[in-house]
Curated annotation (Swiss-Prot):
Topology of the protein relative to the lipid bilayer: Single-pass type II membrane protein
Protein name as catalogued: Ancillary SecYEG translocon subunit
Cytoplasmic side: 1-23
This protein's record includes keyword Membrane: yes
Cited Gene3D superfamilies: Tetratricopeptide repeat domain
Stretches of the chain found on the membrane's Periplasmic side: 43-204
Subcellular location: Cell inner membrane
Origin superkingdom: Bacteria
Taxonomic lineage: Bacteria, Pseudomonadati, Pseudomonadota, Gammaproteobacteria, Pasteurellales
One GO molecular-function entry: protein-containing complex binding
Alphabetically ordered keywords of this record: Cell inner membrane, Cell membrane, Chaperone, Membrane, Transmembrane, Transmembrane helix
GO CC list: plasma membrane
UniProt record similarity statement: Belongs to the YfgM family.
């Protein structure tokens, strides 16, 4: 169960966006930090933290000399040190991807559950929730998979959410509900998603 092309593109776009814009993100409560000096201090501090996390993430992910056990330990340390940041979520998504490629869905579920608690971004949360729901579906956790999809927000995810919902409903034996879900995907999806939904409708 590989990541879809759309998910890969969205994750890579988010990574690039954070590298370019993360250090200039303005948080509303910072307006009360204490005048211009406080703002400048906070902005400099945040920029340094984000730049450091970005560099550490690149080093961690691109390391080819470490064995898997050592790399896993380093990723756990990185996530703990960079808790609640996008880079912690990216690291956990990478781990979940490797686990699914090995069909170790239990490990993938653990990584994605952790990523979901770390994410502070709606788009990133939606991507993680889609992946987690798909993994729970693979594990036969059908009710959990449907529940997880409630955390997927935004119109751009509607078709993928509807297709996965339909797959789960088919597995639960509810073909009427599945038909409605696949038809919804046909109305809101890209050309590829529409074709996928049509194929699933034909197979009902």
């Amino acid at each position: 169960m590989a990541y879809s092309i759309e998910e890969e593109q969205e994750i890579n776009q988010l990574k690039d966006w954070w590298k370019e814009n993360g250090k200039t993100i303005i948080v509303a409560f910072i307006l009360g930090v204490g005048g211009m000096f406080g703002w400048r201090y906070w902005q400099t501090h945040q920029a340094e933290q984000i730049a450091q996390a970005s560099a550490q993430y690149d080093t961690l992910i691109n390391s080819v000399q470490q064995d898997e056990q050592a790399k896993k330990a380093n990723i756990e340390q990185f996530v703990q040190a960079n808790s609640k940041t996008a880079y912690a979520v990216f690291a956990l998504l990478d781990e979940a991807k490797k686990a699914t490629e090995k069909q170790d869905f239990s490990a993938a579920e653990a990584n994605l559950n952790q990523a979901l608690t770390q994410s502070q971004d709606e788009v990133l949360t939606s991507i993680v929730a889609l992946r987690l729901s798909a993994v729970q579906f693979q594990l036969g956790q059908l009710d959990n998979a449907l529940s997880t999809l409630n955390q997927v927000k935004g119109e751009s995810f509607n078709a993928r959410k509807a297709i996965l919902t339909g797959d789960i409903q088919v597995a639960k034996g509810d073909k009427v509900a599945a038909k409605n879900s696949f038809e919804q995907a046909q109305q809101s999806g890209s050309q590829l998603e529409q074709q996928m939904a049509k194929m699933k409708l034909n197979n009902l």
